[in-house]
């Protein structure tokens, strides 16, 4: 499993609008993507910093989304986002929710 961690800085007083845009426009796009598994988003107490983590079956699925659909997502969010979102990618090491764990290396 693979994860995309997107850090977003919102314009002032736009958290509620971001939530609406995410639910009505972005989530439907994500659900259509091959390999998409889950999305979890966090908002800071200041209401302008958001972290969105999406989980994907494979790195290739996440990269395909990043190339083909993510530019559209950035455009959709442009009215509520201040600056350019920062994207980091990771291999999922462990998830109790998805019952995933990294293989334990065998020592000879």
Predicted regions located by residue number:
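Short S/T/G/P-rich N-terminal loop/turn motif that feeds into the first structured element of a domain
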Residues: 1-51, 55-71, 78-108
């Amino acid at each position: 499993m693979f994860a995309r961690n997107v850090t977003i800085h919102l314009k002032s007083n736009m958290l509620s609008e971001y939530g609406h845009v995410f639910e009505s426009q972005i989530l439907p796009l994500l659900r259509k993507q091959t390999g998409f598994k889950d999305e979890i988003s966090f908002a800071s107490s200041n209401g302008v910093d958001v972290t969105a983590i999406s989980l994907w079956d494979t790195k290739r699925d996440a990269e395909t989304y990043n190339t083909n659909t993510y530019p559209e997502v950035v455009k959709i969010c442009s009215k509520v986002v201040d600056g350019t979102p920062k994207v980091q990618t990771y291999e999922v090491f462990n998830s109790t929710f998805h019952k995933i764990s990294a293989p334990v290396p065998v020592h000879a």
